[in-house]
């Protein structure tokens, strides 16, 4: 009863060589509703039926667009009838090409289901439905309008639901789901609907739906042509595993793109499922037993072939699940998601770097040239506390390495206190930059928080703190001292325990001990950190004999932020973003940098008093060193400006690329919109024509009914006239006979 009409073996099938399906069905028709056996051919969006298989002229045609297919359950009275009906669409305002229903009967249940699936695929295919039994490349081609995907949306939806709710479900993929629910979901997807799974949906039902989709693909994920090649890989695996894996990788790469992507997606998901085998009892072998026949199956499914290949297929599928990292390398993974822009904030995207990775990057950090993004975290406990007792060491030597001395002062009178928080990561040789503050810790792991009183910045400030407008450039740290925005005892006496700091490309900081330690009297000879992008500046100390080589690294981002304490009364916003124009255009006061080289502070009050005195006498010190500052800064300005120009040009190029990409997308969407509008206009015109036809047919039907009523009336009148005629004719014939009998002459 069922045939695929793709071949042209007999001459009569040449006109139907592009038919999707053909076979014998029984059709109910005529006024008496009798059953007639007809040869049906499904071609395009039309279902033709012929009197015989060899006929070329169809007896009729059913136009499928706008219709729907309904399956009739088997009745107990007629168990041998497998009925389905093609009826017009359920919407009243939706007119179809034919205004009548067709009741068809198949010989078997499987035959009926195949016909229903094929007809639904034709009806709902243009609307994204009919995916069960549809070719994989056709499904992927249609879903490309929604973006590039590794797997069809049905597979992704099932996998995402199982990831969320079913990875720990015992017997996953082994226990069957509810058959009626699976059937309902299948019909919904085939009708172009997109049903969503909620918390009440059974996990086993969704798993059964996924297996059903893979099982009903016209050609499995591994095509029929590759079946024998994959089986040979399994044979090679049993002899020599390494050679077998290489051959299997070669065969996997030779698959079509859509098949390769789907196989990779499924194998990675199944590997994730088997990682929970201690809970769900589904090991790689069990999953291979379930999915093997759906992924790898022969074209001719005779019992002997299936029996011979079952064990081999299970072994091969188990290898593909457990060794999917080698079979599907990540470097060949297509980009299915848009890349993040250079200014995107990826706070949640950064993975924590292990200690070994930090040390490896620390040893090679001078060779790190790519510009990376830096992640900023909100300070955990911005509390006010007194500074540690100690004597801060002021700067001595040249201060011309910073452009601060040749620009206007930055007014920070309204700035809330910044926070420098101790962090145990310093003991391990690493640190974290958090919203303009550097986290460190002492040897005892005591957590300390230091703030400046009255919301004013009265301490030394690095580029990462001072600029909250720092343009994320190259920072060189001399003699193992980290220049912080807030003074504490660790930076004064030990210079952060004699460790050198380097900024890694991912925004983290590593500290390590120097081989040489500077004398106590020279601990204050440091250079300011550079505030520019991608510029490796050379700094010189007053004493050239004490110069040490340090590591430098590059880190960059569009802007940096300083997080303000929530209990600050003077802050107007939670974060302050400082672009480069704020850095150059603002006024800045740094009494510590402008003060004398050596001062001792024992209490925060003394610190404030001395900083006030420095602010008075700082101008004279600036005047004496202005000539030195101008000479060095002129040389740095050109390189800094060139670096900024290169950064701006690269950002402009990136913006141009994004603009071109967005414009192309907009044009494609506009073109698609015009196409859809044209289709809508055509459909409206067709709808109007069909309505007019329907109106004409209604008029004809009413005329026919009136003519029928008139004919019945005439028939009644004729019937009465005939009865009267026969009754009158009978009376006329009976009376003459009676008169003749009365005139009889008797002869004796």
Swiss-Prot record:
Residues 649-729 form a coiled coil. Residues 335-347, 356-368, 382-405, 432-476, 631-640 have a biased composition (Polar residues). Residues 617-630 have a biased composition (Low complexity). Keywords: Angiogenesis, Cell junction, Cell projection, Coiled coil, Cytoplasm, Cytoskeleton, Developmental protein, Differentiation, GTPase activation, Phosphoprotein. It is found in: Cytoplasm, Cytoskeleton; Cell junction, Adherens junction; Cell junction, Focal adhesion; Cell projection. Induction: Down-regulated after nephrectomy. The record marks 174 as: Arginine finger. Its main location: cytoplasm. Residues 134-328 form the Rho-GAP domain. Residues 328-476, 582-640 are annotated as: Disordered. One of its GO terms (biological process) is cell differentiation. Phosphorylated by ROCK, leading to activate the RacGAP activity. The modification Phosphothreonine is found at residue 452. GO terms for molecular function: GTPase activator activity. CDD domains: PH_RhoGap24, RhoGAP_ARHGAP22_24_25. It holds the Pfam family RhoGAP. Interacts with FLNA. The coiled coil domain mediates the interaction with FLNA leading to its recruitment to lamellae. This is Rho GTPase-activating protein 24.
